[in-house]
Amino acid sequence: MTRLEKIYREKVVPVMQKEFSYSSSMQLPGIEKISLNIGLGAASQNNKLMEEAVAELSAIAGQKAVVTRAKKSIAAFKLREGMPIGARVTLRRDRMWDFLDKLMNFALPRVRDFRGIPDRGFDGRGNFTLGIKEHTIFPELEVDRVENPKGMNITIVTTAATDKEGKFLLDQLGMPFRK
């Protein structure tokens, strides 16, 4: 059991049970998965950029990233169906908890002028998405070796029914939301 999962089970669960007065422990919201995505439009012309993105995303996540390909051809973007346009990885169980711990305690505080995450990223069903402008904030990547800093999307999928429950869950786990 990871450090953050232990905090969830021992501290967050009783607080949420009291706050929302659930009748069953199965109603308690939890984190289902974390999805990481890097979109690279320029990678359709530059294959080296795509390989670099996959390697870096794999290092950040701790498991192999998958290349995402274009579903449709779009002439204005010089894009053909099947061309590589990004990379993604889905984390579950222990890797998910480890990544969330690393994100909240190491990566986000390394962002320049960090004052917390805005809570606008909730989707109405308790899931939270945030964008990062530079992926070099993660400790696995050496800033000197990264040629092209890339942005990425991080989606935290919860079993919470509402945004209020989802925000409370992430807040109790230590997500640094803006006050």
Swiss-Prot record:
List, alphabetically, the SUPFAM superfamilies matched.
RL5-like
What InterPro entries does this protein map onto?
Ribosomal_uL5, Ribosomal_uL5_bac-type, Ribosomal_uL5_C, Ribosomal_uL5_CS, Ribosomal_uL5_dom_sf, Ribosomal_uL5_N
State the Gene Ontology terms under molecular function: rRNA binding; structural constituent of ribosome; tRNA binding
One GO cellular component, as annotated: ribonucleoprotein complex
RNA-binding: present as a keyword of the record? Answer: yes
Known partners and oligomeric status: Part of the 50S ribosomal subunit; part of the 5S rRNA/L5/L18/L25 subcomplex. Contacts the 5S rRNA and the P site tRNA. Forms a bridge to the 30S subunit in the 70S ribosome.
Functional description taken from the UniProt entry: This is one of the proteins that bind and probably mediate the attachment of the 5S RNA into the large ribosomal subunit, where it forms part of the central protuberance. In the 70S ribosome it contacts protein S13 of the 30S subunit (bridge B1b), connecting the 2 subunits; this bridge is implicated in subunit movement. Contacts the P site tRNA; the 5S rRNA and some of its associated proteins might help stabilize positioning of ribosome-bound tRNAs.
Family recorded in the similarity comment: Belongs to the universal ribosomal protein uL5 family.
Q: What is this protein called?
A: Large ribosomal subunit protein uL5
Q: What is the lineage of its organism?
A: Bacteria, Pseudomonadati, Thermodesulfobacteriota, Desulfovibrionia, Desulfovibrionales
